[in-house]
């Protein structure tokens, strides 16, 4: 869905010290609307950016009423409109009628709407109208009901921006993790693990650490796939066949990569500062440790895109949606990181 907003030059945005940041609502039936409302109550957010919610006005008003915060919604006619704490500036980005949708229940209309929110925000970022986009969680069943074949945000964003190489990083205060395979079954993750995939994710991680996180000489830890990193081939040969050759290729590129590391020990070492990032071989191998250590502090960051995109480190939380108890902390951290990266 295209917006009717007039063209805006990047120079017009850069004259304002606080960057314009698009925040997508995510699944309208999940906790996205309420955590956005809570985040926009915080003075610290308004001090670092000019937020724009890309979503649905009636849904946002419903979330504000639920929370009882008394915030005012401001339907935007121009991205340059002034706004202030206590307001929720919103760009209506769907024609779906969501007024009778229910919290915590998958709805095909919400599935379609969450896709429209993403597309509008991507267009704004690609056109230079916003400096970054921050995404609230989407529902993957809703994606399927909307006829979208992508398994998650990361893959959809890569498609919409034309990125050929991309990766998902979870970044916290103590730990940064990049899974080589992401949204697929464990069986498929093992079958699809490749030397090229590890090498590619290693390059993206190294580049992000240098350019975005200002780490001059980053050191990467590369996990093994099997228990004890295969223990010399006793528990599988993927380490010798796939992982070790990928590490050698990274080293030839001048990247300080170490491994294959024993998975049950490497995350503690990285959290203590020995490594600046860990390459995990599959989704849960990497995300369980960082969520255990830094839940609500970690931020999902997509590497390899021509735009800046950050996100929360959690899902739609249908079990608590509509109860007003969801924490906005991960979203706040995602907004802060997006602002920091937008100014580099």
Predicted regions and their residues:
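Contiguous, glycine/small-aliphatic-enriched amphipathic segments in soluble metabolic enzymes
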Residues: 2-153, 192, 196-281, 285-310, ...
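A generic local secondary-structure boundary/capping motif
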Residues: 79, 157-158, 166-169, 211-212
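Glycine/threonine-rich beta-strand-loop-alpha-helix active-site module
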Residues: 145-167
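Short, flexible loop segments at boundaries between secondary-structure elements
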Residues: 160-175, 305-318
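Ligand-binding beta-strand-loop-alpha-helix segment within the catalytic cores
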Residues: 170-199
